[in-house]
């Protein structure tokens, strides 16, 4: 549960100076709609991300507009505060352009204090970021997304400090139970200067993030293989004393759910292991695992496609609409299971081995520009 200071106004408007003679306003508080009404009454325009803006051609016009806003805010029982920081969206734009690869910044506004709590299950962090979201008030943030690399970061102003930022990660696709996950990377405290902040993210945070992701993927595959192996051992024991097709069906049903994790998380591990030389026998094992993954991926996609979004459909539904489908699925996936039982330990041994970087070294961050030079804000 997020806690808030008793002195926090029920409705508040936070003003930040943007590039290009623009001022951004964010409405927050348990009665944030009062603040929104004041902004509308004062002639501020709401953007698609929930931020209100006004563009001014001269300082005097800006001062008059802010004075008008203050009076409107009083009528609507809202407080107006001016941030000492530049607009976070501008900072994120600069950082995104300095990071290696294609990054897209997206501003998010959490007007009501409880909205930020929706972030908690999705954040994958063991540092200051998750603490700030849980115990403080985060009125707005910026996502930095690299769809090519599958990395999604969250950037916030550092709570309790007049300068600086904090950046951490959302969990990548394919993972649940992210809260207090033992492999979670630690969010990074960033300097106020966006160019140096980008360098810190590229040089320190992203390598640590990918190392943590590699460890989590390895643990997920190891756990899945361990459960498959335990069930397979029990199957062998049961069928040795009392052969029964029902035992095989039960094993395949259980193993199917573990195969889903293997199909999701093993491909990057194999790619990781292929980055260095392998003994011939191990290389052949990797080739067999890759072939099994290809088959497994096709079976999983076909199964989910057949169910049209009902991957956990009950047996009665399957028997009615797809008689015999599960038995066919189980027979098809059995060679995939056997391949991983035979060669999975080879993958895990190399995945655990030190000496291979989880990702290629990132491209160098561009050199810092002269102090007087500043890129234009994208529109």
Where are the regions a protein language model picked out?
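Compositionally biased accessory segments in Actinobacterial proteins
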Residues: 1-379
């Amino acid at each position: 549960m997020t806690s808030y200071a008793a002195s926090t106004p029920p409705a508040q408007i936070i003003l930040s100076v943007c590039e290009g003679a623009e001022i951004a306003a964010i409405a927050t508080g348990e009665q944030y709609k009062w603040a929104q009404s004041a902004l509308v009454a004062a002639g501020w325009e709401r953007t698609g991300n929930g931020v209100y803006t006004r563009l001014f051609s001269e300082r005097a016009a800006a001062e008059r507009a802010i004075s008008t806003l203050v009076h409107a805010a009083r009528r609507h029982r809202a407080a107006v505060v001016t941030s000492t920081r530049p607009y976070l969206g501008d900072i994120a734009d600069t950082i995104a352009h300095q990071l290696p690869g294609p990054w897209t910044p997206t501003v998010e506004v959490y007007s009501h204090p409880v909205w930020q709590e929706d972030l908690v299950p999705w954040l994958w962090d063991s540092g200051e970021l998750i603490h700030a979201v849980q115990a403080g008030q985060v009125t707005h943030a910026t996502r930095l997304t690299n769809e090519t690399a599958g990395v999604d970061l969250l950037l916030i102003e550092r709570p309790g400090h007049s300068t600086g930022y904090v950046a951490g990660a959302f969990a990548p696709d394919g993972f649940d139970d992210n809260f207090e996950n033992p492999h979670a990377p630690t969010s990074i405290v960033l300097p106020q200067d966006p160019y140096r902040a980008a360098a810190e993210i590229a040089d320190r945070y992203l390598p640590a993030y990918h190392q943590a992701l590699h460890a989590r993927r390895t643990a997920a595959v190891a756990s899945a293989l361990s459960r498959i192996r335990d069930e397979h051992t029990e199957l062998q024991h049961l069928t040795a004393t009392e052969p029964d097709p029902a035992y095989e069906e039960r094993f395949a049903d259980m193993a199917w759910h573990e195969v889903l994790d293997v199909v999701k998380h093993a491909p990057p591990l194999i790619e990781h292991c292929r980055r260095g030389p392998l003994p011939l026998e191990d290389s052949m094992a990797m080739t067999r695992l890759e072939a099994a993954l290809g088959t497994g991926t096709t079976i999983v996609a076909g199964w989910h496609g057949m169910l049209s979004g009902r991957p956990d459909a009950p047996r009665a539904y399957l028997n009615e609409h797809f008689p015999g489908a599960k038995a066919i699925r189980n027979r098809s996936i059995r060679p995939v299971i056997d391949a991983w039982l035979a060669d999975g330990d080879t993958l895990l041994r190399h995945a655990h081995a030190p000496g291979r970087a989880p990702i290629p070294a990132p491209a160098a961050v561009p050199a810092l520009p002269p102090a007087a030079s500043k890129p234009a804000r994208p529109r």
